[in-house]
Amino acid sequence: MKRDERGRRAYEGLMGVPAEEAFDDVRRISPQMYETVLDGAFGGPLARAELTRREREIASTAIVAAIGGADRRLASHVRGALRQGVAPHELLALAEHVAVYAGFPRALNALDVVHEVLQGAGVPEQPALHRVQLSDHETVVAQKGDHGPAVILSHSLGVDWRMWEPVMERLSHGRRVFAYDFRGHGGAAGAPRPFSMDDLARDMGGVLDAFGVEQAHVVGLSMGGGIAQTFAVHSPERVASLALLATTDHAFDAFEGRARSGEVDGMEAQIVPTLTRWFTAPALATNGWGVQYARELVRRFDPADWAAAWRAFKGVDVQGKLAAFQAPTLVLVGEEDYSTTPEVMSGVAERIPGSTYQVLPGTPHMQTLEKPELVADALDRFLPADR
């Protein structure tokens, strides 16, 4: 293949549009420049596979933003980055990163360009972030929606509130949706240790108090589901409904071993067993944003926080304690969840009389990161809204 043809293919693969269309003005004004760009750049280093297309667009976006004065080209690379699966919040983080090395004026300009491109692409606004002081630590709460019933989302062990981001936009239509970081995670990393499920349930109440919410629809996934159940046991009057995703009402023998492994073997050793427990093989092979996000969070996790969280989860003790729970309850299990299996989750449902049990086809443990559309459909049908 000739170098210029390789350049055309590389450009269209990165940007999604033919080079002739994107560089029409350049080709008319300076055919030599047009050929130089295609041959020297897109037919050369940008056509090689040492860096993925996603990595190249992240790098190109950062470089053009740092150079400054090239807004049209920056916008083109932002669109290319979106095409390569870079998430909107990653592009915003990239602009923030530019501030460290290229200064605030260029970073602020990059934020403007990113925002304009996202708006033009119809990408919803990012959730509003609030810093909230709880009894003995600070946390971060993300909010989408400003009217309607309140919904609070509690994430899985090992991640943070962004686990819910793929479903928050959908759920926020006619609802106020709050996703927060619980102790030892995200904005609440390093909170006082050790802690218990009761502490975590009190923190959930503290988040609701901070926003003046007396009663909420409570949704939890995995350990977040354990927190949700504990909160429902202690404060049933504050729970308008309960949605339990990929969770358990009793501890597993493996929990202590996972805590010890984090302390002894370090976090790099947790990546393979954790991600293969959370995702399907095709998702791991595709390596989309959800897998990358989860992998990086596990890798960066403080081993002390990791161990404290598993030991808290080891103390989950709600089995049979919701037998008299009156609020509507949804139990949502992934067909391909080999951690909190359909057998485990059907037991949870059986011990909450009147609950609705639903199996999501082809879905693993980390439901919102691999099959967000199925989760959003199920929760949107279950949760009331003002529309």
Regions found by a protein language model. Give the residues of each.
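Acidic, glycine/proline-rich low-complexity segments that act as flexible tails and inter-domain linkers
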Residues: 1-54, 83, 106-126, 271-275
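Conserved HGGG/HGGXW glycine-rich cap/lid loop of the alpha/beta-hydrolase fold
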Residues: 138-193
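Active-site loop/oxyanion-hole signature of alpha/beta-hydrolase fold enzymes
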Residues: 165-169, 178-220, 377
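Flexible "cap/lid" loop of the alpha/beta hydrolase fold
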Residues: 229-234, 238-271
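Short beta-strand/loop motif that positions the catalytic acidic residue
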Residues: 325, 331-333
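Acidic catalytic loop of the alpha/beta-hydrolase fold
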Residues: 336-340
